[in-house]
Each structure stands twice: as C-alpha cells, then as structure tokens.
Amino acid sequence: MEQSNKQHRKAKEKNTAKKKLHTQGHNAKAFAVAAPGKMARTMQRSSDVNERKLHVPMVDRTPEDDPPPFIVAVVGPPGTGKTTLIRSLVRRMTKSTLNDIQGPITVVSGKHRRLTFLECPADDLNAMIDIAKIADLVLLLIDGNFGFEMETMEFLNIAQHHGMPRVLGVATHLDLFKSQSTLRASKKRLKHRFWTEVYQGAKLFYLSGVINGRYPDREILNLSRFISVMKFRPLKWRNEHPYMLADRFTDLTHPELIETQGLQIDRKVAIYGYLHGTPLPSAPGTRVHIAGVGDFSVAQIEKLPDPCPTPFYQQKLDDFEREKMKEEAKANGEITTASTTRRRKRLDDKDKLIYAPMSDVGGVLMDKDAVYIDIGKKNEEPSFVPGQERGEGEKLMTGLQSVEQSIAEKFDGVGLQLFSNGTELHEVADHEGMDVESGEESIEDDEGKSKGRTSLRKPRIYGKPVQEEDADIDNLPSDEEPYTNDDDVQDSEPRMVEIDFNNTGEQGAEKLALETDSEFEESEDEFSWERTAANKLKKTESKKRTWNIGKLIYMDNISPEECIRRWRGEDDDSKDESDIEEDVDDDFFRKKDGTVTKEGNKDHAVDLEKFVPYFDTFEKLAKKWKSVDAIKERFLGAGILGNDNKTKSDSNEGGEELYGDFEDLEDGNPSEQAEDNSDKESEDEDENEDTNGDDDNSFTNFDAEEKKDLTMEQEREMNAAKKEKLRAQFEIEEGENFKEDDENNEYDTWYELQKAKISKQLEINNIEYQEMTPEQRQRIEGFKAGSYVRIVFEKVPMEFVKNFNPKFPIVMGGLLPTEIKFGIVKARLRRHRWHKKILKTNDPLVLSLGWRRFQTLPIYTTTDSRTRTRMLKYTPEHTYCNAAFYGPLCSPNTPFCGVQIVANSDTGNGFRIAATGIVEEIDVNIEIVKKLKLVGFPYKIFKNTAFIKDMFSSAMEVARFEGAQIKTVSGIRGEIKRALSKPEGHYRAAFEDKILMSDIVILRSWYPVRVKKFYNPVTSLLLKEKTEWKGLRLTGQIRAAMNLETPSNPDSAYHKIERVERHFNGLKVPKAVQKELPFKSQIHQMKPQKKKTYMAKRAVVLGGDEKKARSFIQKVLTISKAKDSKRKEQKASQRKERLKKLAKMEEEKSQRDKEKKKEYFAQNGKRTTMGGDDESRPRKMRR
C-alpha cells in the first residue's frame, strides 16, 4: 500500500508571532544579552585593538603631491636569495630584467608610489647599521632549511634601536624539504620565532624554488601586492632630519689639478639622489654627515628633473599644460579641443619606469669613470649593418662614426659670424684700447671673465617687450638652472621695448633690480639687452628714490656694498673707493633729513681698515665694549624703549641730535607712527596702573612679582598659583580630565584633538608657503623631501673616489646645530644579554649614535644615593648603568647601540652587538670619582694618639689630607692631625679610643676620573676592503700581535695568606685583690697535681666488641623510644577523639533529659490547685 503524506500548508501571515510579542509593548527581558561573558570578552578585545592602534601624534612632513620613493631594503645572510628576490620584484613591476644589480634601484609601483630597492651586504656590519637608519621597509630573508642565523638577529637588534622600520619576513629554500609534514613543522617554528623577535602576528612569506632564475610569479605577485598597500608611519629621528640615499656620484675634480698636484689631493665630488625627511636648507655651508666618510659642508646644491616621476606627477604637468592652452585659446577667441584626462585605473607599460644608474638597465651601465654600453656577444647576429640603417638614431650614430677629418682640421680657418647676413670674422682689432686701470671699461668678476660693455649702445635699444606682462624678480630662473637652447633663441631675437621713465615706486625698483643685476650680466652682449637698457634707466633715475631694503637684502646677485649704495640712493660715479670700504653696518641708520650718519665712519672705520687702534688703553676699550646704554637707543625705537628712556630724554635735550631719530623706511609717514607709538605708550601705562592696583590679579604675572620684595604669605600665594598653572598645563598636555573644562569640544578624545592641532598647523604652513614664489619658498623652506638633487662637496678624501664600491650604500644625513658640537654625553647603557663578555671601563667601543658611527672610550658609572657618581670597572649583569663618553652631541632620548669589533677578520662566532642604551643628558659637567683606600700602620701609640707611617710619602701630602677621617680595621674612628717633622710622610692622628700596634689604619678617599676626549669616526668607505676597518685596539691585542708577554707586577700577584697565630696570656689577678674579694667572687683554682690521681689511673675506655655492643644497644633503644613516642602520640589522639565522642553523647543525653522534664511538668502541672498542700504536692510515680 502506497504511503500518503499530508501536504504542507504555508502560514498566511508571516508577522503574526511578532505582533503577538509586541501587543503589550516592548518586552526588554526578551532581548537581554544571551551570553554576558562572551560579550564582555568581545568588548575587551575591541578596546585592546583600539588601544594598540594609538601612537604618539607626530607631524607627517612627507609632501603629498610628490613624495619620495620608499626605501625597501633586502637583508639577509649570504646565500639566502637577496639578488634573486630583487630581480624578481623588478621584473614584476617594470618588465625589465637586471643581470648585474648594484646600488639603489628606483621603480614606479603605483600612481602615487615609487620604491627604491637596496640590497644590504650580508658581511658588512657598517652597511647593516646605515641601512637600518634609512629603510622604510625591510624584507628580511631567512633560509627556511637552515633557520635563523646570527646576521638576522644582529640586524633586528640594530633596527630596534634606530626606529624599527616595518619588517616583512621572507622564508626561502623551502623546496629542499622532501616531506610535507617536516615543511609544515618548520614553517610553524620559523613563524613563532619570528613573532618573538618582531611582534605577534608579523607577516612571514614563503618562497619556494627558483624557476628560470626567478621566484614563481604568483608568489612574487602576492608579495608585491602586499608591499604596494603597506602604510608607513613617520619615525622620530627621520622626521627631524633630512637625509638622502645616493644612487650615483661623480668626481668633478679638474684633471689638470690631479696631474699637477698628484693623485693624493682631495677631490670635489657630486652625489645624486632623492631627499627624504625634513627639507634640506638651500644655503651653501650646511653641515651634513656622510656615513663612513665624515662631516662635510655643502658647497653647492641643485634640484634636477626627476628621472623617475610618478604617473600622478606627470598627469599634473599635463593638466597644467592643457589649462594653459585653454586659457590661450580663450584669449584669442578660438575653440579648443583639449579634453580632460581620464582617470587612471592601472599603470600603462610606459609608466612603469625604472632608474638604476649603477646597474645594467637596458644594456647601459654608469660607472665612476665612463658609461658602458652592452653591444652583445660576438657569436650573435649583428643588430646593425653599415648602409642599412633602420632609424634616425642609427643614422646619427653612423654619421658620428664616419669621421673624415680631425677636430683640428675642421676648425682650421673657421671664422666667427655674429649675424646671419654678416661676414665671418677671422681677426678682431682692438680699436677701443680699453684701459686696464679704469674701473668702468674693464670690470672682471672673480673668475676672470669680463662682464662686457657697461655703456649703452646708441644704434639700438632693446629692453622688455611691450606685449609681455611686467615680470617679477622671483620669476627669473636661478643661477643653478641649466641653460637651454630655447632660451637662447628667444633672447637672441630683437624685440621692441617699453620704457617707463616716470615710475619711481617700489615696482620700478624691482624692475631696475631685475634688469641691472640679473644673471645675464655674466653672459655675452647678445644675451644682455636687458642689462644695457637698465644702465640707461639707471642714469636717468632719481637718486632720492627710496629702495625697499626688505627685498634688496634678499637679492643674491648683488653685493652688500651695492645693496647699501642703492638703498642710500648713490651713483657709481659719485662714490669713490674710500666710501666702498666703509663699514656697512653703520649705513643702515638714517636721520630724518635723509643723510647718513658719519660719526663712526669718519673716526673709526678707516682706522680699523688700517689696523690702527683708536683707544689708548685696554681698559678704555673694555669699558666701551661693556657700555650697553650707549648703543641701546640706536637699535630700539622711542615707542619700544618706554618709560625707562623718558628720563634720559628729559635730562639730555640734545639726545635726539646726538644719536639721530630713525625712521622706518617701509612706513610712509614716520611722524604719524611716532604719534601712534606715544598713544600706545600712554595706554600701556594706564593698563599697568590698573593692573598694579588690583591685588588679586597681580600674582598672575610671575616675572614681575619675582622682582618685588614679597612677604611669606604673598610668596606662598604666588607659588600656589604657579603650581596650579603648571598642573593645568600638564593635564592639557597629558590628556587628563579631558572635556571637563570644555564640554562643547567637538573632539571625542584627547588623541583626536592633538591630531587636529597638528593637521591645522600643517594647513597654516602650506597656506603661507603657497603665497610665496617658488624661489622664496625654496630659500625659506629649503629643498623638500621628494626632490631629486645634486649635492657638491669639496675636500673629500681621494680614497672615497679611488675605493668606491657601488654595493655599499652612501647615506647622507643632515645635522642639526646641536649635533655639530662635541662634548660629554651622559647615557643609560646596558650590556646586551647575548653578548658573551661584560664591558670594561675605558675599553674602546664603536657607537652608532644618530647618523654617525664612531669609536670612543666610555666610562661606566653608578650613583650612590644621588650624592656622587661613582665609576664602575665593569658593566653590571642584567641591569642598566650610566655611561659617560666624549662625542658629538645628540638630543636626549636618542637610542644607540654599540659594538666592539666591526672587522670581519676579527669577528668570531659570537653576537656582535655589545651594548644598547639611550641618551639622557648632553654637554654635562659630570664629576666621576672612584674609591681609593690609603693604608698606614701605627709605630707609636699613646693614650688616644698614635703616629702613623707608610700612608704618605711627603709632608705636603699629609697637609692636603689634614682633618680627614680615618678608621682602623677594628672600627675605631680617628682624624689626621698634622705631619711630623722628621720621618717624611709620617703624621700624628687622634682616635676615639686607644688602638693596638696590630691595627691597620685606612683612609677612604674618592679620586676624580676624567672622561678621555677620544673620537674616532668609522671611515669604512675610504678603505679598499670595506669590511676591515680597525680602530683603537686593546693593549692585550697589541701584545698578542707583537708576541709580547704580559708584564707581571709582584704586588698584583696572588699569594697564600699566612696569618700568624696570636697567643693571649692568661688573666692574673693580684693576691691583694683576691683577698678583698667576697667569698662568692673568689677565684677557686686547684693546685697542680704532681702525681696521677686515682680517677686518672682508673679511667674506663671502651674498645672492641664492647664498644660495638653498646652502640648497637643505643641504636635499638633509640628506635624503641621513637616507637614509644609515636605510640603515645597515637593513643593521645585516640583519647582525644573518644573524649569528643563522649562529650557529644553527654550533650545529647542532657538534651533528652530537658525535654522529658519539660514534658512531665507540662502534664502534671494541670493537676495542682491553688489551695491545699496535698493537691499542690506531686504524686509519687510508680516504678
């Protein structure tokens, strides 16, 4: 029989259950938390994650429009596949194959991102230290088949103390595992060990075998994607200093100097690279440090076109050009067809640029001597056949190669054609006969080049074109920009000009400065038409015109004398040579009538040039130098001096005529300004009177109150106000009690408030910078990060050029003003727990502090209850100590690490990082002392006085220590009185008790220890073998190298201590004293026996079997007693339990008796009556 099932019927109303649930309102209990514990754990985890994301707010100074490329360092032991990994990543990002990888390699990895790959030499500790300071991302390669090696752990510890960049682990050689289970176990072990060193959850990639010289494409794709989206946080040291990784360098030394002076002369070197960190000052003379070379001053710095721009930057340039074309077409009334650029979704192949000047990119290799082009092998098919050129490039090359005449033959008989319709000139006769001595006709610059004609030629007048707009001085190209042919063509064409002879304002002054002192003065006449027109304008210009001194002093193409001359309105002809040599500083001050004060110039300036002193004695000169009031009025205006100078002006009515009344040249009406200043002074006086009259508010001005004579209560109130102000400031800075004072604050947390402040300040700075011209911004801000620059250094050692190796990085770091100075640095230091030996004071130690690597002699110290700084001979175990060393100053809280050996030949199998620490104080006058014990012996003893010898060698030394505290070994304290006359070095001392001849007298003293001023920079890049730098060696190492024995001091040798046994005589009491003693205290002594007594003769001495038997019986009795005591204890415990049980039974029995009595009296009490005795007495109960 077939089974029949009931058909399912769907519910007609789906929300019926929900309607029934909410008929009586919302039921809160129905929606309670199902698992409160799980919810609490989830909230705790969310809070922990949010707290781990918080960091100290820091200013990110990286420019957003064109950031510098991120430095990706590939680090690992030898043979782990560093070169293969770089080759694979470059192939993935640029589709270019590199055969010889040397130096930095910059590639475009995204629309806004570039990467600079750098391979770290595996065997050079110096390169590891330098790369750890500049790397943004570290690809740490690990041999998965072998495990972690010493170089890996050393680099991680170095990076931890230099900012700790982002670290990605890459495990290689995993194809050598045959078993999958072993591979999984090895991966797990490597991952957890890597997490221990970096952080929990650090990413570790796995790369299998190599295919065709590269890693598998899928694995490299995953790694490159992870690198491209990684975010980097600014590090403190890099956020405060400019630095650069040089990608190439050039020797600019003139070959003639090398030939004449020899190969050992210092060189002029230019290095190229991208700037990172903060902006680098554009002024020459900026101090920088090249790691491995030394400190240098920047001789010249120039910004170059970016050799590897990002697509975003290129798109901005294209948009700028397109907008410019639109504006020009709109001005001409044309319709433009220029369209906007579409949004990029992916990189085109043409945008995947690569820049590696020291590697063989595209068959071109740039070396320090030449540029090498790979032309292929001989057995390959030739890519070029003469006569069968395939393009313009090949035609150009064949044209250059087919030389029929030499250079001398080509230029033989060739003349100079100045104009297109002119004839060639072979000779030029000197018709003008220029006088060498005249300053107008022959003016030469420092390099010996003539500046050309100074007078205006009459036939033609060339100047500024009419159709062009007025140019500003900031629109001129700088001296550092390269010269192009387009400018050549434009400047060579004659153009009509418009000359305004009536313009005498500031704008006209700017034009004159543009036309007379531009960079075209040093060029030839055909490029200097603006200068010639300006010379004519300069003669017709009014001398009374006021120049803008604020713009004149920033013109770098004129001298200070020219700046003063223009500001004073003088002409070249009216100024003789004596006026040029006058002191420039006195010319900055003018009287109201427009004349320059000549008091100081007339009397003293000429004498100073002749080196003739105008003071009779040195005392007069010192008095004049210390007199501040004599020159105070020269630098401060009347409104600034205030009330203090009113009495002086009243007492001396001629003071205005004596010192002159100065005017502000940038202000149009100085008299109105003086009136405004006087009004402001009166207002300030009224405010000060009101403030002083109010006693409650007077304590807020702490600086003014400290100068007054305050009572004790007023001082307490002022100190309390100071403390309250400091407490409030501390709470604001630390974020405590946030939102209590200001409840309407729009920020939820203090962290968001600080980030908003930083972003607001950055926005204000950017607005100010955008209002400036590019030249002004570069002068004030410097070359910002992301700029590709060329920096020239002079006096570089020739070994740097001779022994250059592109495999070792060249790192240039900028120095702050504090870091240029040298002094004593106090730091907190600890020996690394993996280093084998403890460190000894004054042993040389190579420190990596800031950009520098240098060798110094540290002294390890500790503090004794904050009273003295005591020297330690060795570093303590597992704890920090203080260290003082001489070296370059660095800001406090700067971490550093130290190593003892950097040469590979002296390195063993141990861990090389010897110490780590942090700077606490700089340039301190630290007083370090060490303990010194002087030992003496008494040779004459009186009651409380003794004569001591063998402690000092002369009476002078004793006089130095008069009054010093001394002490004996037995603890008797004393004091040094004075020296004795006859035995030299002996002295008299007083003690608190009589001492013995056997006592040793000790003087505890503290001897000052000075830090040795030893600074030896690690110049590893100057060596041919970069890994073999050896600094100051230890004495033991020198003796071992020279095969010398260690000299032995007999006093320092250890001997067996043989102490003489002391015999003490018995106490003898006189008989007269014994007779006076009471009977109880008398001394009872037996007289010595002449013969043996009975007890001595009959003494029982056990031996043999009897002794064994007695000892056996004793043991048996001991065991029996132990058993009896144990049995007694057991019986006592049983008796105790039985008594407890009996007490419980007795209690139960008494409880039953009570209940029976209660029940009996309750029943029989009803039968009694109030009357008769018979009825009141109870009846006898039957038995």
Swiss-Prot record:
Residues 1123-1136, 1143-1160, 1174-1183 have a biased composition (Basic and acidic residues). Residues 1-23, 451-461 have a biased composition (Basic residues). Keywords: ATP-binding, Cytoplasm, GTP-binding, Hydrolase, Nucleotide-binding, Nucleus, Phosphoprotein, Ribosome biogenesis. GO terms for biological process: endonucleolytic cleavage in 5'-ETS of tricistronic rRNA transcript (SSU-rRNA, 5.8S rRNA, LSU-rRNA); endonucleolytic cleavage of tricistronic rRNA transcript (SSU-rRNA, 5.8S rRNA, LSU-rRNA); endonucleolytic cleavage to generate mature 5'-end of SSU-rRNA from (SSU-rRNA, 5.8S rRNA, LSU-rRNA); maturation of SSU-rRNA; maturation of SSU-rRNA from tricistronic rRNA transcript (SSU-rRNA, 5.8S rRNA, LSU-rRNA); regulation of rRNA processing; ribosomal small subunit biogenesis. Residues 119-122 are annotated as: G3. ATP binds at residues 76-83. Residues 207-216 are annotated as: G5. Its main location: cytoplasm. Residues 104-108 are annotated as: G2. GO terms for cellular component: 90S preribosome; cytoplasm; mitochondrion; nucleolus; nucleoplasm; nucleus; small-subunit processome. Its EC number is 3.6.5.-. GO terms for molecular function: ATP binding; ATP hydrolysis activity; GTP binding; GTPase activity; mRNA binding; U3 snoRNA binding. Residues 68-233 form the Bms1-type G domain. Residues 536-559 are annotated as: RCL1-binding. Interactions with RCL1 stimulates its GTPase and U3 snoRNA binding activities. RCL1 activates BMS1 by promoting GDP/GTP exchange. Residues 1-39, 427-494, 639-709, 1123-1183 are annotated as: Disordered. CDD domains: BMS1 (cd01882). Residues 435-447, 468-491, 653-697 have a biased composition (Acidic residues). Changing residue 82 to A: Strongly decreases binding to GTP. The modification Phosphothreonine is found at residues 504, 516. Residues 172-175 are annotated as: G4. Gene3D superfamilies: P-loop containing nucleotide triphosphate hydrolases. It holds the Pfam family AAA. GTPase required for synthesis of 40S ribosomal subunits and for processing the 35S pre-rRNA at sites A0, A1, and A2. Controls access of pre-ribosomal RNA intermediates to RCL1 during ribosome biogenesis by binding of RCL1 in a GTP-dependent manner and, via its affinity to U3 snoRNA, delivering it to pre-ribosomes. GTP-binding and/or GTP hydrolysis may induce conformational rearrangements within the BMS1-RCL1 complex allowing the interaction of RCL1 with its RNA substrate. Required for RCL1 import into the nucleus. Belongs to the TRAFAC class translation factor GTPase superfamily. Bms1-like GTPase family. BMS1 subfamily. This is Ribosome biogenesis protein BMS1. The gene is BMS1.
